Amino acid sequence: MNKKTVKILVPAGALGIPFDKNALINGIKQKPDLIAIDGGSTDSGPYYLGSGKSKYSYSTTKRDWSILMEMRAKAKVPLLIGTAGTCGTKSSVEWMLKITKEIAKENKEKLKIVALKTDLSNKFVLEKYKSGKIKPLEGAPKINEDIINNCSNIVALAGVEQIQKAINTKADIIISGRSTDTAIIASLPIYHGLNIASAWHGAKIAECGALATNNPNSGVVLLEFDHNGFTITPMCKNTKATPQTVFAHMLYENADPYILLEPGGYLDVSNAKYKKHKKNSVRVEGSKWYNKKPYTLKIEGARLVGFQTISIVLIRDPKYIESIDKWIDKLKNSFYRKIKNSILVDVQLELRKIGKDATLGNLEPISIDINEVAVMAIFTANNQEKANDSAKLLNPDLLHLALTKNEPMPTFAFPFSPPEIDKGPLFEFCFHHVIEIDNPKDFFQLQFHKI
């Protein structure tokens, strides 16, 4: 079980993000022990967790996964993906499993596949909540029984113990549900008895592939772990890792650049040393790992809160551009006046200016002259029909509402016909919490598939 060194090849920050195939081939020549790649995150909002769908296209995912499966076969090492299908739900793991089986069938390949399911039932989470085992993190939203029961999907982020159980099956391919970005990399060196702190530290640095180098778009990096530290080497020509690019990645999605919280403990890199190694590599030693009890896993959940339809109108009239805020207020007042005492009375309308203060709003520090502006109307209702009906109700005003009673009726422009675009279900995140567990290794379910 114990090894002196472990090499892990990370092709990209996530499956679906482009990587340099020549760099990948070069990485395979280094004889890695594992190919590991992330499959998603919550970065793209709650829709994907709520719906259990992937943000990446099926064809692109299949193309890139096919390349990685080909490289795995050449290297004769396991291929591991974490947070499969963007959100890591049961349905997205099944989606990834379907792609894997299709590729294997096309290539007439025999495989042993393990799927790690990290979903939690609403009933289980509710029981843990009632027993005080669900703990809020800083800034966590308030939760209650109704919120927990109404979550369409709840997942826990697997740590190294759960990934190691999958690795121990000697599967050719491991498809994991939601996991921490680092656990899929840290698991193998820890499994082989190497430095725990260095395993977590190296995993953090390489979680996004070549983002910790001077050429982030190149994708592929190789990590080599031992008993004292780790070395990171980019596999693309003319790409370098420097002490600065490596340490800087500790700031990425991390509130404290010296502390990294993970299942079962935390990493402290306060005393870590980053040194240039050979031509384009960086050697890192000196980080510390501290176990923490009780053992906790972060949980994520999303629930359906409505349905949305949007309409967009384009305005070029200088008078209306100058008075756009007044016009928006009048538009909103007109809408709420129309829906009063109707079945649409509970519909919410949000109006956003596009092209003027669209990102920062009142905090925008730069004032510039503009010659056109778009207004996006977002209608939120408890069903799609009401959201769409509300958009149709406001249609004439979006196109022709005048600022004052005594001026000619204006005409603006819709970029589409019909202008109403059904956005579909609206989800919101429900948790920023951890769950206390007693049996880390046996907490999730493994499913075995042979092809």
What is the role of each PLM region?
Residues 121-176:
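An acidic, phosphate/nucleotide-engaging active-site surface
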Residues 1-29:
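N-terminal amphipathic/basic leader segments beginning at the initiator methionine
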Residues 29-47, 75:
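N-terminal glycine-rich anion-binding loops that anchor highly charged ligand groups
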Residues 9, 54, 77-88, 173-174, ...:
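Short glycine-rich or small-residue beta-strand-to-loop segments that form or flank ligand, phosphate
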Residues 2-11, 36, 78, 154, ...:
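Small-residue-enriched flexible segments
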Residues 14-16, 41-43, 84-94, 177-184, ...:
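Gly/Ser/Thr-rich loops at beta-strand to alpha-helix junctions
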